[in-house]
UniProtKB/Swiss-Prot annotation:
The lineage of its organism: Eukaryota, Viridiplantae, Streptophyta, Embryophyta, Tracheophyta. This is Ethylene-responsive transcription factor 11. GO terms for biological process: cell division; ethylene-activated signaling pathway; phloem or xylem histogenesis. The keyword Plastid does not apply. It is found in: Nucleus. It comes from the Eukaryota.
Length: 166
């Protein structure tokens, strides 16, 4: 099943042709493109372009970066794997904000270099509680508690109905 794509090109009654999502015409004839960052709730300037189609494509690239396959774009994007994901690889030429999504690389080297958090060795019989505050000024609190109790094994399969009660 092909993904549904929402497009936003709209015919206007003013005779100016087509209007695109995230594109506005400047008084001197060029077209400006911008988009709202869904995470920071701020506008991201994508640049000015000679044609409305160029500006709309810049908007589409960034919309796919921010929202993925659920992005509302100006142009239909049928081949998600080849076309849309290649759009996310390159930023527009006049972008002033870095992408919110880092490249996905699950190798252990990149994880340890990008996330320099302390590593804690946990042995069997220990529980680690990690409590994080919502405040920007507080630090992480780690409690390590020694657990000496015995394990209880439940023979439980959630695919079957519960046993009858006595």
């Amino acid at each position: 099943m092909a993904p549904t794509v929402k497009t936003a090109a709209v015919k206007t009654n003013e005779g100016n042709g087509v209007r695109y999502r995230g594109v506005r015409k400047r008084p001197w004839g060029r077209y400006a493109a911008e988009i709202r960052d869904p995470f920071k709730k701020s506008r991201v300037w994508l640049g000015t372009f000679d044609t409305p189609e160029e500006a709309a494509r810049a908007y589409d690239k960034r919309a796919i970066e921010f929202r993925g396959a659920k992005a509302k774009t100006n142009f239909p994007c049928y081949n998600i794997n080849a076309h849309c994901l290649s759009l996310t690889q390159s930023l527009s030429q006049s972008s002033t904000v870095e992408s919110s999504f880092p490249n996905l690389n699950l190798g252990s080297d990149s994880v340890s270099s990008r996330f320099p958090f302390p590593k804690i060795q946990v042995k069997a019989g220990m529980m680690v509680f990690d409590e994080r505050s919502e405040s920007d000024s507080s630090s992480v609190v780690m409690d390590v508690v020694r657990y000496e109790g015995r394990r209880v094994v439940l023979d439980l399969d959630l695919n079957f109905p519960p046993p009858p009660e006595n």
